[in-house]
């Protein structure tokens, strides 16, 4: 196969810059990274200067994703020679163990790293990733809670914990995690939407009211969030049909549901879609409107 430089008429400098761009964007396009990176380290290592080390790491991770253990091991050996004893390189060794499904070896390695450096967040997160890969959600939850006791500001960890609680159907704790996220990210419409979905799933009139409120907030933050729009419709519809709701509450929520249904219809009509599944979705909305005796304007 022709080399990248020949196929695309690019220089090694352009390839190096492309690798840097992928790193900055956190791209996980493993096949491309591996193809470009392997040519760089094979043919231009002497020209790359200190960039060679971060490229070795980048290529190694891509090779693990792609199942190229030979390339991953080559990169790892080069990094070990240059940085003996480095925790970062040890973590890469652990990631290779993970790719080989040698989970116990990886856990032991991460534990040794944490004994030497208890603040090493990367090693902690790798341990959590292993628990999830093994389907040990309860252990992953325990590890994440311990992690968040020390690193309470890690938003990614809070969201990961919320997802794990949702998978375990522990919606009250999932809601708590999402509340933490909304406090620090009040303008993130996706957190509002997910919190609303959790409250909707919990059920009960009070939770449904909260659900409708946060679906509305998600829409306020992003008026193109169709999932939030459908959520607003569903939560308002269920409140309107709840026997514990007052007459005023039912009347208000019939109005909210009607507004949401009209917006859904308009969105589909504006998009000009005619697919069968879209028509079915619209028919379902219309049927629910009829059930609730909502008159569309």
UniProtKB/Swiss-Prot annotation:
Keyword Acetylation belongs to the record: yes
Pfam families: TPR_EMC2
The keyword Repeat is annotated on this UniProt entry: yes
GO terms (BP aspect): protein insertion into ER membrane by stop-transfer membrane-anchor sequence; tail-anchored membrane protein insertion into ER membrane
Subcellular localization, as worded in the UniProt entry: Endoplasmic reticulum membrane
InterPro entries per the UniProt record, alphabetical: EMC2-like, TPR-like_helical_dom_sf, TPR_EMC2, TPR_rpt
TPR repeat spans: 87-120, 155-188, 192-225
Cystine connections: none
GO molecular function: membrane insertase activity
UniProt keyword list: Acetylation, Endoplasmic reticulum, Membrane, Repeat, TPR repeat, Ubl conjugation
PTM comment: Ubiquitinated when soluble in the cytoplasm, leading to its degradation by the proteasome. Interaction with EMC2 prevents its ubiquitination and degradation.
Membrane topology summary: Peripheral membrane protein
GO-annotated cellular components: cytoplasm; EMC complex; endoplasmic reticulum; endoplasmic reticulum membrane; extrinsic component of endoplasmic reticulum membrane
Residues modified as N-acetylalanine: 2
Known function: Part of the endoplasmic reticulum membrane protein complex (EMC) that enables the energy-independent insertion into endoplasmic reticulum membranes of newly synthesized membrane proteins. Preferentially accommodates proteins with transmembrane domains that are weakly hydrophobic or contain destabilizing features such as charged and aromatic residues. Involved in the cotranslational insertion of multi-pass membrane proteins in which stop-transfer membrane-anchor sequences become ER membrane spanning helices.
Similarity field: Belongs to the EMC2 family.
Self-association and partners: Component of the ER membrane protein complex (EMC). Interacts with WNK1 (via amphipathic alpha-helix region); promoting the ER membrane protein complex assembly by preventing EMC2 ubiquitination.
Name this protein carries in UniProt: ER membrane protein complex subunit 2
Gene: Emc2
């Amino acid at each position: 196969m022709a080399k990248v430089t020949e196929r695309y008429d690019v220089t090694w400098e352009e390839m190096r810059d492309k690798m840097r761009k992928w790193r900055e964007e956190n791209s996980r396009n493993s096949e491309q990274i591996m193809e470009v990176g392997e040519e760089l380290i094979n043919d231009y290592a002497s020209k790359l200067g200190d960039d060679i080390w971060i490229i070795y790491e980048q290529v190694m991770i891509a090779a693990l994703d792609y199942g190229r253990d030979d390339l991953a091991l080559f990169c790892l050996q080069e990094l070990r020679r240059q940085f003996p004893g480095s925790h970062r390189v040890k973590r890469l060794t652990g990631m290779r163990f993970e790719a080989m499904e040698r989970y116990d070896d990886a856990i032991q390695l991460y534990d040794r790293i944490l004994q030497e450096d208890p603040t090493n967040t990367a090693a902690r997160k790798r341990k959590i990733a292993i628990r999830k890969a093994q389907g040990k959600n309860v252990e992953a939850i325990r590890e994440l809670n311990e992690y968040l006791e020390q690193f309470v500001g890690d938003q990614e960890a809070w969201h990961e914990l919320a997802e794990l609680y949702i998978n375990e159907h522990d919606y009250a704790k999932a809601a708590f995690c999402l509340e933490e996220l909304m406090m620090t990210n009040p303008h993130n419409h996706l957190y509002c939407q997910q919190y609303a979905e959790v409250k909707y799933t919990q059920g009960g009139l009070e939770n449904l009211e909260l659900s409708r409120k946060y679906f509305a907030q998600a829409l306020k933050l992003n008026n193109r969030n169709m999932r939030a729009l459908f959520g607003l419709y569903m939560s308002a519809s269920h409140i309107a049909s709840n026997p514990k709701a007052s007459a005023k509450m039912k009347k208000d929520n019939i109005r909210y549901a009607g507004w949401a249904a009209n917006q859904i219809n308009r969105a589909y009509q504006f998009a000009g879609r005619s697919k069968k599944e879209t028509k079915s979705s619209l028919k379902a909305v219309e049927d629910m409107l009829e059930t609730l005796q909502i008159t569309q304007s």
